[in-house]
């Protein structure tokens, strides 16, 4: 099934790729290669990204990708999303393909079976101290106050107060490795997830976005409560 994204450089067409939690373990060698290529392309375009979520946790705790993770997590600014979409054609020349795309501010690119999730953050309209992307939200300092950090033989941007971010997102015991992802899904479970992702891909965007907005509200509320109750 062919999908498409409109960019200022023309229509980018891509194939449906089922991606869901627990689909595979990360291949650290390819992940390092992919991250380095993406950084080079973004640097040349004067676009910056931030290591986030599990990738940030691995960088500051293991100084490596987490063995039981499955992908790379990055954050960019929503205002840079159109420029990043323009780079899809350049990234294709390096072996990357778009795997999934949500206009609200999320996409995944894949190369050699390893994918990178990119979350596009923007100011939260109901609280000037917060920024959000889709159903994730955090204090604005975590996406605005940054510092360079050595990782995988290069230097990447991370939140300056990364200790506080890890406490916020992963809990007080964030320094203790805990495997939360399971990679032993049954064939029926994999097929079910494939069908869900396929239906989502073929539904009209307006229907998908209404559903996403509805399911995101309680999750955002949960995160906001945690932000303002955290010590």
Can you annotate each of these PLM segments?
Residues 1-28:
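Extracytoplasmic cell-surface/polysaccharide-interacting catalytic and binding patches
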Residues 1-4, 212, 216:
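Interfaces and regulatory segments of ATP-dependent nucleotide/adenylate/phosphodiester-chemistry enzymes
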Residues 20-43, 88-139, 143-157, 165, ...:
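Conserved catalytic core of two-metal-ion nucleotidyltransferases
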Residues 39-72:
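Active-site nucleotide-donor binding segment shared across nucleotidyl transfer reactions
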Residues 47, 93-96, 171-174:
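Short aromatic/hydrophobic-glycine micro-motifs
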Residues 63-83, 153:
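Catalytic metal-binding acidic patch
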Residues 163-175:
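Short, surface-exposed, low-complexity cationic segments
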């Amino acid at each position: 099934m062919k999908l498409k994204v409109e960019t200022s450089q023309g229509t980018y067409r891509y194939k449906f790729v089922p991606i869901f939690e627990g689909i595979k373990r990360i291949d650290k060698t390819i992940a390092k290669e992919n991250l380095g290529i993406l950084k080079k392309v973004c640097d040349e375009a004067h676009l910056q990204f931030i290591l986030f979520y599990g990738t940030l946790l691995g960088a500051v705790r293991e100084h490596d990708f987490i063995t039981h993770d499955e992908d790379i997590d990055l954050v960019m600014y929503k205002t840079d999303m159109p420029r990043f979409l323009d780079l899809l054609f350049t990234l294709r020349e390096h072996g990357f393909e778009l795997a999934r795309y949500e206009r609200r501010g999320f996409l995944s690119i894949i190369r050699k079976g390893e994918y990178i999730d990119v979350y596009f953050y923007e100011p939260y309209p109901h609280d000037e101290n917060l920024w959000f992307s889709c159903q994730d939200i955090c204090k604005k300092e975590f996406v605005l106050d940054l510092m360079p950090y050595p990782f995988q033989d290069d230097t990447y941007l991370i939140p300056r107060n990364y200790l506080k971010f890890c406490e916020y997102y992963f809990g007080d015991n964030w320094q203790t490795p805990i495997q939360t992802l399971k990679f032993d899904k049954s064939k029926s479970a994999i097929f079910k997830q494939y069908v869900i992702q396929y239906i989502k891909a073929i539904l009209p965007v307006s229907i998908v976005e209404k559903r996403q907005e509805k399911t995101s509200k309680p999750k955002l509320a949960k995160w906001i409560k945690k932000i303002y109750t955290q010590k």
